[in-house]
Amino acid sequence: MSKILVFGHQNPDSDAIGSSYAFAYLAREAYGLDTEAVALGEPNEETAFVLDYFGVAAPRVITSAKAEGAEQVILTDHNEFQQSVADIAEVEVYGVVDHHRVANFETANPLYMRLEPVGSASSIVYRMFKEHSVAVSKEIAGLMLSGLISDTLLLKSPTTHPTDKAIAPELAELAGVNLEEYGLAMLKAGTNLASKSAEELIDIDAKTFELNGNNVRVAQVNTVDIAEVLERQAEIEAAIEKAIADNGYSDFVLMITDIINSNSEILAIGSNMDKVEAAFNFVLENNHAFLAGAVSRKKQVVPQLTESFNA
């Protein structure tokens, strides 16, 4: 039997990397599976900070599961096929551990699925470690903690579940870090956007959603200064227009999120701007508008877009 590959979504963030790494280890220890954690892209700057801090080598990057000789895969932090490995339909999905909506997903065989409406996939994996009484090393605790911090913006996001607030201190203790100090340093490491090209910036954390027959790309960048990002609006818009033309997106929505004040500016271009405006009850001026209190793509952007596009 070939090795089972475990990976998060394309354009991996700290939760995609952390949850896949941790679950691959858990699957070996608790279930006796022959697993390897891989990634569908290079770590972003935030995740690179995490890996360096805990002395963990970045997982190798793959573009095809079958090319690796894999017949089975386990997905963490995603389930939608368009967010997964390119040949996902050609291999067996052995299992899924996720905290997102379920869409564009079907399998030929029964599978293991663990889906919970919590702040991160890493939160789920950590509880599975406890359920199976598997010891958590400092490194794995650090990766899971980082995934939780990243996805909940240090427990400030509305996606944060009460259980996330309970396990974060546990993981911080296991990882040997101060939760607040480490969390802020980690998040700030991911806000260095000046060195990024516009093309890189709009692809740091981007996912495609199928909304009523439309392929809508929703990207998010974290910053401590929204105005600084908007100074690059012309080049960002040019990059978005090219991405739309090259990939057949109907619309592109970019969340520029202020991690300090917990607000976002929405920059949007595409064929359905009336639906985008209706989703958030605002008017785009020069292609952008302020969205107070919005920090979560999963809870404060995608559901609203879905409802509007389906109206």
From Swiss-Prot:
Alphabetical list of SUPFAM superfamilies matching this protein: DHH phosphoesterases
Class of the enzyme per the UniProt entry, highest EC level: hydrolase
Subcellular location: Cytoplasm
Cofactor(s) the protein requires to work: Mn(2+)
Listed EC numbers: 3.6.1.1
Matching InterPro entries: DDH_dom, DHH_sf, DHHA2, DHHA2_dom_sf, Mn-dep_inorganic_PyrPase, Oligoribo/pAp-PDE_c-di-AMP_PDE
Keywords recorded for this protein, A-Z: Cytoplasm, Hydrolase, Manganese, Metal-binding
Top-level taxon of the source organism: Bacteria
A GO CC term assigned to this protein in UniProt: cytoplasm
Broad class of the protein's primary localization: cytoplasm
Assembly behavior: Homodimer.
Protein name: Probable manganese-dependent inorganic pyrophosphatase
Organism: Streptococcus gordonii (strain Challis / ATCC 35105 / BCRC 15272 / CH1 / DL1 / V288)
